[in-house]
Swiss-Prot record:
GO terms for molecular function: rRNA binding; structural constituent of ribosome. It comes from Cupriavidus metallidurans (strain ATCC 43123 / DSM 2839 / NBRC 102507 / CH34) (Ralstonia metallidurans). GO terms for biological process: cytoplasmic translation. Signal peptide: none annotated. Belongs to the universal ribosomal protein uL6 family. InterPro entries: Ribosomal_uL6-like (IPR000702), Ribosomal_uL6-like_a/b-dom_sf (IPR036789), Ribosomal_uL6_a/b-dom (IPR020040), Ribosomal_uL6_bac-type (IPR019906), Ribosomal_uL6_CS (IPR002358). Keywords: Ribonucleoprotein, Ribosomal protein, RNA-binding, rRNA-binding. This is Large ribosomal subunit protein uL6. Part of the 50S ribosomal subunit. NCBIfam families: L6_bact (TIGR03654). This protein binds to the 23S rRNA, and is important in its secondary structure. It is located near the subunit interface in the base of the L7/L12 stalk, and near the tRNA binding site of the peptidyltransferase center. SUPFAM superfamilies: Ribosomal protein L6. Disulfide bonds: none annotated.
């Protein structure tokens, strides 16, 4: 059994936590995030730490305690330092550039792919073949990165496509006569 839920979350300077009407909200320099609290979990805020307790002794309450603690830890990290995901474009003529708040991708299609960024998520293009997606909400950052990668996932023979910077693409051997 994991004991993630029992570990307290230290609140860094600049992070404020508020628990009201069954909603946990965390405010920091990068914005505000909120998460509904499950009825099987109790939240305690004291002396710069955030702790979670199960409301009863059921297995579901113990599981939700760990889940709520992990979500809250991601919220605290998100509003203080933020999250980022790096993508690489591999292929001849594959390019990315910002067009206002949207991301314009040239991925070998007959048309350019324009991906609108949701609220709270920003994209940067340090080079034409690199994309950095940043934001306070870990789930949104990962979702946007997955959506951009899905336009042209890495193909298994040459490795062309959009990939995460830390992703290793295993190449297949071509058919021999």
């Amino acid at each position: 059994m994991s004991r993630v839920g029992k570990a307290p979350i230290a609140l860094p300077k600049g992070a404020e936590v508020n628990v009201a009407a069954g909603v946990l909200s965390v405010k920091g320099p990068l914005g505000t995030l909120s998460q509904p609290i499950h009825s099987l979990v109790k939240v305690n805020v004291a002396e710069g730490t955030l702790t979670f307790e199960p409301a009863d002794e059921s297995r579901e309450a113990n599981a939700l305690q760990g889940t709520m603690r992990a979500l809250a830890a991601n919220m605290v990290k998100g509003v203080t330092t933020g999250f980022e995901r790096k993508l690489q474009l591999v292929g001849v003529g594959y390019r990315a550039q910002l067009q206002g708040a949207a991301l314009k991708l040239q991925l070998g299609f007959s048309h350019d792919v324009i991906h609108e960024m949701p609220e709270g998520v920003k994209a940067e293009t340090p080079t034409q073949t690199e994309i950095i997606i940043k934001g306070a909400d870990k789930q949104k950052v990962g979702q946007v990165a997955a959506e951009v990668r899905a336009y042209r996932p890495p193909e298994p023979y040459k490795g062309k496509g959009v990939r995460y910077a830390d992703e290793r693409v295993i190449l297949k051997e071509t058919k021999k006569k």
